[in-house]
């Protein structure tokens, strides 16, 4: 299987380079909005475009991905809410396993059903341990998954969950407070997790200020994902990207 994007993510982590990803929900954008998001992402040097959502109820996924690929060279990574959210036109797929919940369907059940189709897609598959954290309000992902999120103040639960995911073979850990969360994941929780895993750490949900994106990276996040805030104000793309990319690169330096 291909591993181009994952190798890039792993190398960036090794070097201490932070990445910024814009999350695009196909249900919430038309061609005009999509063009604007892509144009702003190119100008802001966005690293990745994530496409998907907890509920994609339209059949626009393929059209959305093809439109993006035609317009730019930014890698497109699928962020599926269900096995049906697959487009062969993307570059890679976050193959999400909800390791923070106790719903067997989202841990492995749906993957058994989707595996043949995922393999046939030709996409780069990135096994991802998905950890939902309480963002202070009910979210679509928590409702759909019927799973209790990790309490916002229980850093040790998040840490042990991420460690277990890594030891089970997950190549990425994605911690998410959910779209439109009132309370983003704390820096202390991010640091607790980042200090105990070696795979790249993705953080999303409730990030509305560039300063928070910066602080998350300083705490140990490798990739910052923002979607809801950008849907409301697309001009935030540059500010968020600049904040993430301004984090000093400290690892991988020869200090001898």
Which residues are covered by each model-predicted region?
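Short N-terminal or domain-adjacent regulatory/targeting segments
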Residues: 1-11, 30-35
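Alpha/beta enzyme core
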Residues: 15, 19, 26-203, 208-249, ...
């Amino acid at each position: 299987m291909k591993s181009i994007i994952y190798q890039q993510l792993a190398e960036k982590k090794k070097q201490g380079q932070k990445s910024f990803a814009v999350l695009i929900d196909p249900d919430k954008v038309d061609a005009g909005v999509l063009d604007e998001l892509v144009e702003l992402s190119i100008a802001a040097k966005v690293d990745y475009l994530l496409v998907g959502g907890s509920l994609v109820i339209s059949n626009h996924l393929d059209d959305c991905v093809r439109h993006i690929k035609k317009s730019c060279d930014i890698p497109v990574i699928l962020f599926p809410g269900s096995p049906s959210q697959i487009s062969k036109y993307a570059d890679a797929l976050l193959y999400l396993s909800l390791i923070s919940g106790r719903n067997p369907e989202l841990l492995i059940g749906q993957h058994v059903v989707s595996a043949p189709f995922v393999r046939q897609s030709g996409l780069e598959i990135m096994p991802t341990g998905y950890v939902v954290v309480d963002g202070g309000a009910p979210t679509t992902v928590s409702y759909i998954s019927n799973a209790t999120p990790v309490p916002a103040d229980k850093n040790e639960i998040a840490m042990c969950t991420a460690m277990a995911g890594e030891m089970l073979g997950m190549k990425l850990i994605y911690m998410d407070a959910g779209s439109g969360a009132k309370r983003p994941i704390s820096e202390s929780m991010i640091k607790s997790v980042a200090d105990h895993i070696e795979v790249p750490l993705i953080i999303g949900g409730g990030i509305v200020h560039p300063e928070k994106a910066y602080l998350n990276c300083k705490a140990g996040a490798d990739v910052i994902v923002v979607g809801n805030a950008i849907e409301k104000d697309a001009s935030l793309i540059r500010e968020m990207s600049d904040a993430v990319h301004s984090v000093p690169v400290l690892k991988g330096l020869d200090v001898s």
